[in-house]
Amino acid sequence: MKPIAGLDLDAYLEAGRRAVEGALSDVLPPLGSPPPSLHEGMRYTLLLPGKRLRGILVLASCELLKGRRDDALPLACAVEMVHASSLILDDLPSMDNATLRRGKPTLHAVVGEANAILAAIGLLNGAFALIQESAGLKARARVLATTRLSSAIGAAGLIGGQVADLEATGKKIDLDTLEYIHAHKTGALFIAAAELGAIAAGGRARDIEALNQYAKNLGLAFQITDDLLDYSGNPATTGKDAGLDRNRTTFVNLCGIDGARRLADDLIAASLASLASFGRRAEVLAGLADRVRDRDR
């Protein structure tokens, strides 16, 4: 399906971003709580200004299935906490050795590598605690959400993708291997976000599967556009180091700029096709897919 012209997507995304960021500020212990260095580190990366795309995906998926935003908000925060944790770990000297994240120095450059690792672990732990403390969700929904998110993080998800990425560094790999890496390292959390939103709404299995396919294609398209931005983007706009991935295989240096763009377009088309059964109700998710394709940061 195509996004509806009358949708004020900017207003929706901004409202979602504000809702998620406001809730994130409340879920962590206040500054000064012992040990203060830990909580300062957890807050540093988590609360850096961002699009909150994954959190918004939780909210939009829940609302698509007529669920309550308030029920989905803790799950949106949990997904954003996991994402922030993954960024901290990905930026480490032993991983990508990045110096810039969202326009600010990476956490390990501010607090040291050991404290950055502990902050990442703290965020992961806090994400699951937040799900279990979500009073608006039934016990079964909390269990399903915990199981789904832990699977997205683990060896069959984000961690597995990161290991495959590290092993591929400095090697020539084919498109299937590259897609495997990013379907797990990036796509798994997109899928979990959509599914957690559906779980919060009490969605049916067929609805969850449709959202799974939507998010699977969306997540991979997001990574391709990320590679395009890394190749040609301005750090002042993207908030990240430019050219950081030029010593490893990316969609750009494997497929070329035009080939990568065509692949992203095809994935967005597949993502939109997955929404067909929802009709006009899926206008937000359709608009979100178009934003991923056209992103500049």
Feature locations, PLM:
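N-terminal amphipathic/basic leader segments beginning at the initiator methionine
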Residues: 1-28
